[in-house]
Amino acid sequence: MEEAVPAQTVEVIDPEVRAHVYSLLGGFNGEDADKYVLGDDALSCLRDIKRWLKLYDEKFNRMDVARCLGEANLVNGDLIQILSLWWREGQQSKYMTRIALACVELLVPLTWPLEIHGEMTVNHHRHIPYLQQAQVGYKRGILNMASCGILRAVIRIGLPSMAIPPSERTARDEGILKIMLYLLRNIAIITANARLAAEGEEEETSRSATINAFHDQDVFALLLTLCSNVSDDFNMLDIPLLEILFHMVRGIDVEKLFMNDAQRSAKRTDELNDLLRQESSMRREYAKNAPTRHGRFGTMIWVKRDDAKMSTVSGQDVLRDEQTTLYKMDQSKRWNKPRRGRKAQDMSVNNDFNTPVHISPSATTNLRMFVEEFLDSGFNPLFVHVRKAIERESIRVLDINKRHFLYTVSWFLGAERARRARQREKYAQSGKKPDNELEPDSFGLVAGVLNQETFVFLNRSMQNSLDNKEWDDLNAAMRCFTQILLTVQEMSQSPLEEDQEIAENIQNRIFYEETTHDRILAILRGYTDQGFGYLDACTELSHVFLRMLERYSKTNVDMQVRSRRRARKRKREEQLVNKGSDEEQESEDEDYAEAEKMSKERKFDFTRFAAKFSNQKCVDTFVAFTKFYKELNNEQLKRAHRYFYRIAFKQEMTVLLFRVDILNLFYRIIKGPGGMDSSKPIYKEWEELVRQLIRRLIKKLEQRPALITELLFSKINSTAFYLEYGFEKQTVTTSKRAPAELEVDPKAASTPEEKLSIVVAALVKDEQSALVKWISEVLGSAADEREAWELNSHDVDLAGPRDTQNPIITVKSQDNSFKRAMFQNAKLRLLMTLLKFDRLGQENVEGISWIIPSELKSDELRESKAVIDKALLIGNTDERDPNDLLRKKYSHEPRDGFSGQNLDVNFGSDSEGEDVIPDGPLFPANPRSKAHALNELKQKRKKRKDKGEEEPVDEETLEERRQARLENTRWRLAKIKSDLYVHASDEESDAEADQEFFRLEEERRNEQSERIKKALLLGRTEDAGNKARQRKRGKRSNEPNIAGEEETSGKRRRHSGGTNVELEEDDILMDDMEMPSRASSGEYSSNDADAIDKSMAAAEDELYFDDDLAFGRDRDKDETSVDRDGADASSPRKHNDGSESAEEDIPLAPPNRRRLRAGFVVESDSE
């Protein structure tokens, strides 16, 4: 028998890495066990740990160092102790302050939130659970040190940097402020993982404990200060502030936040009563079928069904009655639903705002005080600044920050509404307002998110999220839009006339765009399985939008909406006589083929718009929402009730609700089992609704027996109309549009015979040979008729002159298919056009007659018939597909209907002394405009399709887009994390870095002096000489430079030098950061210019407008430009390096005669 091999111990961390990290933990002195005493090498140890975190964990995407530090209890055992020691004793010591700052730098990466994503390695799965639990311990240690005030100590470290004006603030100061805020954000994010075993009390790290700690240690005061001054003094800290606010308020009920103690106690009592009532209801339902002491013997019965089949049902409860037996049979049925692909779940727990969070009364009081102060002072500055940063796509903005922004705006708007509601209740109870609040409050405190820019941003975000199927982002956008609508509704009811006018203007802008209406409808119809939070948001948005739109349309009878559609330019009958070249023609054809957006205003009809919500998909969405009736509150149940009432009784589309599963749901809500609690206020309304629906169902079954079958299926529009009214909907047939006119590619054929052969071959390939034969017969009969007429007319001419012409011949056919083809078949129409057939009249509609004009002689008709017969007999002799040789024909007239010719308008004025007014147009046409337009078309040659013709984006494309956005987010996040180290925080001065800096400066000065000496000896610089030679190529070598060239070249040099700026990085927290000065070295690269042009949006964020260095650079460039201009004007000859020529006695060369062309001055470089 083989011996069992003992299991080997798996090393989760490389032993060498563990030994290196543990060797760094030696910065403390253990002589006194009762007091934490720093060792001499404490600062060096902290610096080494920081290097290991940055160079090992972040560079190799591992978590070994963080795991070792967690096992060694570095945070609670050392870093927090050092910060508390600094707070008590070392605030005046510069050395201790540097050590404390190094501790904060370590706390930020160690507390950075850990997310579970799809690209995790084995190492991540091994370390993340432990590190998540360790971070909870870190947070517990930071919050529990209230006596020492760890958070207050962190704020104290950043206060000196805050006090410095922005123009004098260095990169180190900005870095200190960033790590301070990121540490606060990490503390707000860290929560206990429900999947892991909790160590200690969960209340110590809960949201309530975090809020209380932030209030007690002045974190809320810091946030208020930064938010209210974010646009002026702290413009790079808006995103961390937004994230802190989001993680502080997500999931908290706004209504409970602004309740007083009595209301909160009553609310809590009602919730407890509801839970007890649900429990008693569940017990009653269970007691109906619960086993008794006597029911110890099994029971099995046979049930004979209507189709003479037998079914087996077991259990004594089936003996009670027939209904119970059938219900037991239904419960035993199992539907083998087809399995689909596993749905990709969003595992980012830290950004979930659908899960409700409960906080303690003390935390509620503290948070309410902060929210009120934030609404009064910091709401507008912060959210306006964040919105602008998101619109600019700043490098510091991640994709998740848009979701943070939208949800936080919606939450604070709801808080403002709740605060006003509580104030009104307080005033109603007291009977009068306080003396300091005699005037009603204006909505100016939240006006920063009620402007047109926010609406444009919100609509764009909703549309992008809907197109890319980013459901969480769309959920946040819908919540934001709903709160904006509710806020505007309250503004319209404000006693201030100014607020009423603003609300009227906002509603007009929101409801004016029909695209907004269509988007709301598409969101409601597109629900599948996005979760209850998304379902709640989309149903609430549609309910609020419909209700407000109905009220607004009633008060504004003449309401107009703007509908946008894509339309194509209609073909014009007349064509321009003069045609351009083939290339020009192709470009113009593609230009005319592009679909353009057309805007059209029309009167709004609310009944017509509400009818769009009367379809089966919208009903299914609200049915899915109603299935959660046991968990819904009164407002949500009322929302669903109002929708079904609108469908059944306002829109008269009751048949949409006549489906077995919907009727079963409504019956179960009222009668059970597991029905709605009858004590709820909304129960009576639901009961009456269900009763009326059942009554109408019975009547409808008597009128329409076919409804019995249709109860099993969803109703399409035609079926619903028939079941409702008893007859099919009458549709009015409209005349069809003529097909697009075709033409033969001029490159493929030049003679009429070749064109006819190509068209005949195309018809034959499309199996339309019968049409070609019919046309041949028409030509033959027309030739015979025309020949007889010509002979007869010849005899008449011999007798005497006549004035009559040859009669026209109508193209007729007894076959209806040929008649339809004359209008619908574009190739047949092209063939008749090439044969010089004409249409009677100018209208191109179905049924119009084609004729053979009198100008065509019998010989011409016979020649055309011979060509067609030959092409039909021989077939296609070309290897190319004849269909590829045909193309659409477009009119070359201007699309706006303007003829393009200049009007002979005279703008002469006698007051200006004009005696003779020239004839003709005042401003002749620009002969080069057409060429520019063609070049632009060639560069932007892209055909757009109609929205209805666009194919839906498949899942693979969406997944590729998601992966691209995810990679971009990870790159930005990695940049933020890797830069979260304060530059020069370890030392105020670095001798090695200074020595390297001075050495480089010495080399640059030496190179510059050599270039100056060489320029003085040669009379020019090498680069300038090369440029001058290139510029003067083809000219006489002895021709002197004219003033225009000198001035132009100087301007070009100044322009190129002006773009040579170093963009400051968004996150400047980097070790050993160098800012090379390219201006001093005189080197400039075109790649740098391209990079600068591509990052103009980022440059707006990174450039501090109060930075003296930034303005100093601009002033230096301006002064240099002014000096050059002055020197050029004063000195006759000036070299490129700015030095005057040594030969001052050389006579000045006379200026060249200015060249004139067509009355315009032509400079030397304008060729």
Swiss-Prot record:
Basic and acidic residues: bias regions: 572-582, 959-969, 996-1013, 1110-1127
GO biological process, any: DNA replication checkpoint signaling
Organism whose genome encodes this protein: Emericella nidulans (strain FGSC A4 / ATCC 38163 / CBS 112.46 / NRRL 194 / M139)
Pfam families membership: TIMELESS
Biased composition (Polar residues): 1078-1088
Residues covered by region (Disordered): 332-353, 563-594, 889-969, 981-1093, 1105-1167
Keywords for this protein: Cell cycle, DNA damage, DNA repair, DNA replication inhibitor, Meiosis, Nucleus
Subcellular location(s) per record: Nucleus
Function recorded in the entry: Involved in chromosome segregation during meiosis and DNA damage repair.
GO molecular function: DNA binding
Broad class of the protein's primary localization: nucleus
GO CC annotation: replication fork protection complex
InterPro entries membership: Timeless, Timeless_N
Cleavable signal peptide: none
Stated name of the protein: Topoisomerase 1-associated factor 1
Compositionally biased intervals (Acidic residues): 583-593, 949-958, 1062-1074
Keyword DNA repair: yes
Family, per entry: Belongs to the timeless family.
